[in-house]
């Protein structure tokens, strides 16, 4: 189960681009909490704290308990915008989580036993097709990751979605497709080029070639022409 982190926020009273710019000048980032049958609630968050959380990774699958003036709400980030040039946060959206609710999230896949994989030991390579899977999960029990064990895969073997053990209550959003998660590809074999093959065939072989050289060297020189 994913860890729930705490996050302090303040109520935001102005809306629109002008109000958002004013919030950012104060070192804060505008955001909104929505969903769960309650009205949308504009908020502001500390710029440095939010920026750190976004770039720490897995921001969109992290549960937060947001405290707005003493009122705590359980939420999950659903979207955020970054400045296209500076890559700094501009806005963030949070979805309220009600008891018993479910939601769609991208859950990362962790690949185990890559070093001991039989196919890798024989020269194969791990080809990861999907680094994450979209799942519908309980809002109060979001998995941090799904594991894929490569410990028994040979060269040309694959792991598909149905081979993964999903946590209780979690199901893939694309249940009609048993897509590939990872494959073990064979080692790359460099084929001999036609030019190299022709050169090898034309090269002198064994003692016959060695004897031919002295014979050619022993041939008498042509007589000089008389003037």
Swiss-Prot record:
InterPro entries: Rbsml_bL25/Gln-tRNA_synth_N (IPR020056), Ribosomal_bL25/Gln-tRNA_synth (IPR011035), Ribosomal_bL25_b-dom (IPR020057), Ribosomal_bL25_C (IPR037121), Ribosomal_bL25_long (IPR001021), Ribosomal_L25_dom (IPR029751), Ribosomal_uL5_bac-type (IPR020930). The keyword rRNA-binding applies. GO terms for molecular function: 5S rRNA binding; structural constituent of ribosome. GO terms for biological process: translation. GO terms for cellular component: cytosolic large ribosomal subunit. Residues 1-22 are annotated as: Disordered. It comes from the Bacteria. Signal peptide: none annotated. The keyword Ribonucleoprotein applies. Keywords: Ribonucleoprotein, Ribosomal protein, RNA-binding, rRNA-binding. This is one of the proteins that binds to the 5S RNA in the ribosome where it forms part of the central protuberance. Part of the 50S ribosomal subunit; part of the 5S rRNA/L5/L18/L25 subcomplex. Contacts the 5S rRNA. Binds to the 5S rRNA independently of L5 and L18. Belongs to the bacterial ribosomal protein bL25 family. CTC subfamily. This is Large ribosomal subunit protein bL25. The lineage of its organism: Bacteria, Pseudomonadati, Pseudomonadota, Alphaproteobacteria, Hyphomicrobiales.
């Amino acid at each position: 189960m994913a860890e729930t982190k705490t996050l302090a926020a303040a109520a935001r009273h102005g809306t629109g681009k002008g109000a958002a710019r004013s919030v950012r000048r104060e070192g804060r980032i505008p955001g909104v909490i929505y969903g769960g049958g309650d009205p949308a609630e504009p908020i502001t968050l500390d710029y440095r704290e939010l920026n750190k959380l976004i770039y720490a990774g897995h921001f969109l699958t992290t549960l937060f308990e947001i405290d707005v003036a003493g009122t705590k709400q359980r939420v999950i980030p659903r979207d955020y915008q970054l400045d296209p040039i500076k890559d700094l946060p501009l806005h963030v959206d949070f979805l309220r989580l009600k008891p018993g609710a479910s939601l769609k999230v991208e859950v990362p896949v962790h690949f185990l036993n890559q070093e001991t994989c039989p196919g890798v030991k024989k020269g194969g390579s791990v080809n990861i097709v999907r680094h994450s899977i979209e799942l519908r999960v309980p809002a109060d029990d979001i998995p941090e990751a799904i594991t894929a064990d490569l410990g028994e895969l040979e060269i040309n073997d694959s792991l598909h979605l149905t081979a993964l053990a999903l946590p209780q209550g979690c199901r893939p959003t694309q249940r009609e497709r048993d897509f590939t998660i990872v494959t073990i590809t064979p080692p790359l074999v460099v084929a001999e080029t036609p030019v190299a093959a022709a050169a090898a065939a034309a090269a002198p072989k064994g003692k016959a070639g060695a004897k031919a050289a002295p014979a050619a060297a022993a041939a008498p020189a042509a007589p000089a022409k008389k003037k």
